[in-house]
Amino acid sequence: MTTGLVILLSLLLLAALLAPAGLRRLFRPSRAPGTSPDELGLAAEDVSFATVRGKRLSAWFIAPDPAPGPAVVVLHGWGSSAAELLPLAAPLHRAGLGVLLLDARCHGRSDDDDFASMPRFAEDLDHALDWLKARPEVDPTRTAAIGHSVGGAAVILAASRRDDLRAAVAVAAFAHPRWMMRRWLGAFRIPYPILGWWVLRHVERAIGHRYDDIAAVTVVDRIRCPLLLAHGTDDPQVPFADARAILAARGGASVELLPIDGFGHGEPEGVPRLVPGLMDFLSRAL
């Protein structure tokens, strides 16, 4: 394919994606169906609470046993839902932890919005943590957050702005939104030197944040609680090198890296390989 044709097709694609309707489609993923706690034999309370912009979030809450006790918010990735992370709920609850499985805006059963983004995931996570700490079954001094993919990056961002978490866990988190977007642009064969940089600036304006201000490699050194980076060595979407980059940027923060050999980006069958290291970390931190 000639360079001229690549540019022409890229321009047509950009016109579709970056028009207001295209941006809404791009940043409002289709909602993933899933199972419920009942189907897995978990007794969960169906709850909802407010987030920003007058929206409401849906979640499943499993109280700690015994209560009051420690508890964690679990946040899914892009285009996923709380249902996708239900396999983590059982081992967490067996360890005596309360679990709040959250649907971010535009995902699962939560309210829609004009778009979703990693900073909005972090906003929703903040509201979920505040709701969790107010529950009488929860010890508010022993709370943590676990996130996958975009949710993992949101955990790092939220944890960098809070001083009331005992632990944070980011599974398959990307190190920098720009790196993630460049990989995405490459998949569409959009030439970065010619058009890609403009796309990234346009998206920054659309979401209201500069990538450098919200990147994990920028904010990780501000985290005041222990952070676990769990990452599959065979992740095809967010390379393992991203986890190493976050670790290298940690400064004085307490950060541990848990490589999961042979694990991809988040296949359910890989959860058993994540659980031992996750539970060891949480038992020490909480």
Predicted regions and their residues:
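Catalytic active-site module of serine/aspartate enzymes centered on a nucleophile-bearing elbow/loop
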Residues: 270-286
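Short beta-strand/loop motif that positions the catalytic acidic residue
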Residues: 222-223, 229-231, 235
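Conserved alpha/beta-hydrolase
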Residues: 91-111
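An N-terminal hydrophobic leader/cap segment in hydrolases
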Residues: 2-50, 60
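Hydrolase active-site cap/lid region
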Residues: 157-209, 267, 272
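Alpha/beta-hydrolase fold nucleophile elbow
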Residues: 137-149
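Alpha/beta-hydrolase active-site loop
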Residues: 84, 115-136
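Conserved alpha/beta-hydrolase "acid-adjacent" motif
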Residues: 236-242
